[in-house]
Amino acid sequence: MPLRKTKKKKVLPKSPRAPKLQPSELVIITGLSGSGKASVLKAFEDLGYYCVDNLPVDLVPQFADLVADSPEINRAALVLDIREGQGLDRLPATLRSVRQIVKSNVVFLEADDEILLRRFSETRRPHPLGISMPVKASIESERRRLAPIRKVADMMIDTSKFNVHELRALIFDRFGHARTQDHKKILVSCVSFGFRKGVPDDADLLFDVRFLPNPHFVPEFRPFTGRHPKVAKYIRSFPQTQEFINRISELLVYLLPHYISEGKSYLTIAFGCTGGQHRSVMIAEDVKKRLATAGYNVKVVHRDSPK
């Protein structure tokens, strides 16, 4: 009996991996219980950092790898505290390996014993070590256990004289100004349009995306726009789509600081396809996300797409 030939499956080329648009940065927040770590983490979150609370020490190197490799995460902050237990003893050694993976800063928070006692009294929450000992003894024990970590910290903040708002302002001043203030000086608009209805008059930069496969010729996609998940997935499935988004994003991140230095306060980037329904819409959305991740103030406008 003759052997039946089997058809070989067609293997599609993998889409190129998105490049990092900004240098990676990891901030590790640690310190005494009641010193304000939750408030500081919230401040980093408001600055656009990807935030994680109470990650096990043994997972920190893996998280550092993620921050270093992921195009979606440029800046991250995580909290490590006494809840980790004996794992904290390994933190100084872990930090040495993490610093070889990604730029890292350790922020150590502390406060006077009297202030910590008052905060625990006001919140009526037990100290993490206070199940079998008084709060004051727990604070003293925690201070001793965290002493080796305090020695390797890049920044120490005594929160005794700070309220929540002042502590937030301090974090914004130390970590937010250099990274976000200049970015906020310019408003970026990503506009999608159709060439059928003409080119936007206010476009500073214009890109023709009609070289991408057109979903209009796929009957099931015709009623929808590039914002529909299935349509967007279809357009992204082509290697040239990801290559274009990667290259355009890199170009824009290079150009924007130069526009800012010349005093430009807004920039309109237009992406055009035939009807302004599918390809240009999807590209404008994806580029907007990339620029927002890089810290810029970005809005998206779909001129010719149904609202």
From Swiss-Prot:
Is ATP-binding among this UniProt entry's keywords? yes
Pfam families, from UniProt? PapZ_C, RapZ-like_N
GO MF annotation: an example: GTP binding
- Specify the domain of life of the species encoding this protein: Bacteria
Provide the residue positions that the database annotates as binding ATP.
G31, L32, S33, G34, S35, G36, K37, A38
Residues reported in the UniProt entry to bind GTP? D81, I82, R83, E84
SUPFAM superfamilies annotated for this entry? P-loop containing nucleoside triphosphate hydrolases
Q: Which keywords accompany this UniProt record?
A: ATP-binding, GTP-binding, Nucleotide-binding
Q: Which HAMAP family match?
A: RapZ_like (MF_00636)
Biological role stated in the UniProt entry: Displays ATPase and GTPase activities.
Q: Which family does it belong to?
A: Belongs to the RapZ-like family.
What's the protein called, per UniProt?
Answer: Nucleotide-binding protein Acid345_3782
Lineage per the UniProt record: Bacteria, Pseudomonadati, Acidobacteriota, Terriglobia, Terriglobales
